[in-house]
Amino acid sequence: MCSIGEDDFGDEGAAHAMVVEALPLGIVLSPGNCSKCDVNSNELYKLNFREAECRECFLAYARHKFRAALGAAKILPRNAEVLLVLDGSAKSLVLLDMLHFAQTQNTFKRLHCNVHVVYVEEQHVQDRDPVGLEDLLSVSRQYAPFEFYVIELGQGCSLQRIKDYSPSLKANNELIYKLQKLQSLTARQDYLQQHRKNLICSVAQSLHCTHVFESNISVDLATQLLTAIALGRGASAALDVALLDDRLSGDVKLLRPLKDLSEQEITFYIHAQRLKPLFQNGSHYGMERGQTASIQNLTSAFVANLQQNYASTVSTVFRTGDKIAVNSNPEQASCVHCRSALDSELSDTLLAIEYSRSVSEAGVSLNKNEKDLEGLAKKRLEKQDGLCHACRTIQAEFDSGNLL
């Protein structure tokens, strides 16, 4: 298995292949010679900082990035049980197609693992019509012999084989009820992300999978890094953007093998393989509310603007996340909700936040002195509720009930 290095793939494609932009970026439909193999092609693919190349050379380049990400760290043992998370987006179909291709190679190049695919149905949470069952069946037939399953977000016991799947009633979804009880869209989106991660972990354990593949690409991870810091999850931000995330329970490991791919490469791959996404990107929960509706929406819009106008800056953000180290302490307790390390030390920042919250809750009937309020803030931080700071913030927004 190959490994990836700075010389092979720089911040914007291949650093060693930087050229003056003579051709427009994108898919050039006029015939020409491939810069790699010199074969005449009717369809050339022009990536940033790369010469125009034919379909076969582009696919080899993109698939090499996928294999190199796994090979660099050698984190996927032979014959591992892998759960691939499919959400119907273009990038998840690209991951599925790449993994299927890697499974169909000869013995020397074959990626030796046993693959299960789970489609996470979350359209009902967004109050949208679910993806057609026939479309899902078509995908499962195309990528046989992978085993396909379906599970609905908010329905932990709804895991079914795709051939046996029947949608459950929306009225029975407890997740929708919990989301309605949260006051801000920021808290809802954060809670939904953590809930989804825990649901996928439970599916992996049910299917006896030791590794989970998610389809996050570079721009997603740049957004996630900034969002995590803004939400008070900075201590675990490194794991949010790393190739390997080992916070899931039951020794399940989360892998992001597409982390080095860009949006442009995903678009080209979809075109080259004639794949049909089940829905378009940008349909995440709450995105239709506008850019300023939540911290997540605002950060996503900010990164999208950077990607459009200063593409190398986005790559710098993403690569910075790669360089952040996690303070690993085996004896440190973990948050019962997000599995991140607990904020065990009493910091001035957290104390100031809880102090402000205590003052706000006291309101106009404030009759406590400064020391009483500071003592109350310290008690809150020392309370053994098993939640990190970010998850306590979500808990504080519940009108009633418990986060878990």
From Swiss-Prot:
GO terms for molecular function: nucleotidyltransferase activity; sulfurtransferase activity; tRNA binding. Pathway: tRNA modification; 5-methoxycarbonylmethyl-2-thiouridine-tRNA biosynthesis. Its main location: cytoplasm. One of its GO terms (biological process) is protein urmylation. It is found in: Cytoplasm. Keywords: Cytoplasm, tRNA processing. GO terms for cellular component: cytosol. Coiled coil: none annotated. It holds the Pfam family CTU2. Plays a central role in 2-thiolation of mcm(5)S(2)U at tRNA wobble positions of tRNA(Lys), tRNA(Glu) and tRNA(Gln). May act by forming a heterodimer with NCS6/CTU1 that ligates sulfur from thiocarboxylated URM1 onto the uridine of tRNAs at wobble position. Belongs to the CTU2/NCS2 family. This is Cytoplasmic tRNA 2-thiolation protein 2.
